[in-house]
Curated annotation (Swiss-Prot):
Keyword Disulfide bond assigned: yes
Compartments where found: Secreted
PTM text: Contains four disulfide bonds.
GO BP: any one term: killing of cells of another organism
The keyword Glycosyltransferase is annotated on this UniProt entry: no
Main location per the UniProt record: secreted
Protein known as: Megourin-2
One GO cellular component term noted in the UniProt record for this chain: extracellular region
Lineage: Eukaryota, Metazoa, Ecdysozoa, Arthropoda, Hexapoda
Signal sequence interval, chain numbering: none
C-alpha cells in the first residue's frame, strides 16, 4: 500500500501554479519543477494578463 508521503506526492505537484518572472525563466524553472513526483511533466507557461509585469504561471500535465 502507499504511505502518506507517496500519497502526498501524487496529490501535490509543487510546480503547478508556480509563478516566474519572464517567459524564458518560466520555461526553465517549470520544466524542472514538473519533473517532480506527481507532476506528470511540463505542459506550458501561461502569461498572467498584466502589461507591466511579465509574469508567467507554470502548468504541469497533472497536479
Amino acid at each position: 500500500y502507499l504511505d502518506v508521503n507517496q500519497i502526498a506526492s501524487y496529490l501535490l505537484c509543487l510546480g503547478q501554479g508556480a509563478v516566474f518572472n519572464g517567459r524564458k525563466t518560466c520555461q526553465i524553472g517549470c520544466r524542472a519543477a514538473c519533473q517532480q513526483p506527481g507532476c506528470g511533466g511540463y505542459k506550458e507557461c501561461e502569461q498572467i494578463p498584466n502589461i507591466r509585469l511579465h509574469k508567467y504561471r507554470c502548468h504541469c500535465n497533472s497536479g
